[in-house]
Amino acid sequence: VNWTTRDYDRLERAITDRGRIQVMRRGSQLVLIPERLRTDFGEEVLSARHLGTGERMEIPLADIDAFEVVR
């Protein structure tokens, strides 16, 4: 994803509203509950929980191929 301000706004709104997002990463589709966006050594990282397993995931934004907010 070439992250635009609109993409950041949608992601931040999903975090604030405790919404769900669908993420494509390395050919895998994941449905996540985003919790936090942070910077780690200059790299933006999404902290989220997997919807099915509840597993906490840390995904660098650079690794996300596509994302959509799920309503």
Regions found by a protein language model. Name each.
Residues 17-25:
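A short, Trp-centered hydrophobic/proline-enriched beta-strand micro-motif
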Residues 30-38:
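Short beta-strand-centered aromatic/proline hotspots
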Residues 23, 46-50:
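SH3/SH3-like beta-barrel fold
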Residues 1-14:
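Mixed-charge, Lys/Arg-rich low-complexity intrinsically disordered regions
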Residues 58-71:
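Structured surface patches comprising rigid loops and adjacent beta-strands/short helices at the edges
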Residues 28-29, 53-55:
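Short acidic/polar mixed-charge low-complexity motifs
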Residues 37-43, 69-71:
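Short, conserved beta-turn/loop elements at beta-strand boundaries and strand-helix junctions
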